[in-house]
Amino acid sequence: MIDKAEGLVLRTVVYGESNKIITLLTREYGKLAVMARGAKKPGSRFNAASQPFVRAIYVYPRSRGLGQLKSADVITGYSKIRQDVFLMAYAMYLLELADKALDERVPQPALYDLFVDGLEAMDEGLDPDVVSFIVELRLLRHLGIAPHLNGCTVCGSVEAPFAFSLNHGGLLCRRHRQEDEHAVSLTESVAKMLYVFSVYDFSRIGTVDVKPETKRLLRQIMDAYMERYSGLRLRSKRVLDQLLNLGDD
């Protein structure tokens, strides 16, 4: 039986002299790998469709093992991202996040849409930090380890101001702020921003102008939370951080 799936290339591995094993995140079948024979050869019909964060329609025989790619029609390669080394680094981080966090052959169309929509938003000019925050928070929610952002984790109060507590896994109100001496104080607008990023999809975000100091604070919070609760250690994240540090010098 032949399967046909819309997919996003998460990573590729060279196999032999001219072949590639492509790991795809597909809408229909979840994460899976296929063999693209001859993909490394100049002029190969699979060359374009086997590049990271290319989205295409892939046709291959159904198999419990490694299927052999029969055809691929590229939908988009996100050309604007490819022209910017910083955007490339953000995109590679999102791809590795999907690759490491998602199980194989478990269809999850909502998460497929999340990563595709994130790349499209970045390609269309949305701040890549905002894209990353949204993807991270939505993915954490799917994994069942999202921070509590719609009120105090202790009493449920929705009255600002709040602080973010890594130990409590979310917000603390003024009354319970003292329960974590390391909690990070947030303005009302920043606390609301975190909540919005966790529940809105990209079509509802629109144009967002986030101050550099706010992005640094949110990144500090998200990095610490991801490290504590997700258990993911991503090489692409270290590369991205190094690149951003160079850009700040």
From Swiss-Prot:
Keywords in alphabetical order: DNA damage, DNA recombination, DNA repair
GO cellular component terms listed in the entry, alphabetical order: bacterial nucleoid
TM stretches of this protein: none
Family, similarity comment: Belongs to the RecO family.
Keyword field contains Lipid biosynthesis: no
Pfam families per record: RecO_C (PF02565), RecO_N (PF11967)
GO BP term, example: DNA recombination
Protein name: DNA repair protein RecO
Described purpose of this protein according to its UniProt entry: Involved in DNA repair and RecF pathway recombination.
Endpoints of the signal sequence: none
UniProt entry tagged with the keyword DNA repair: yes
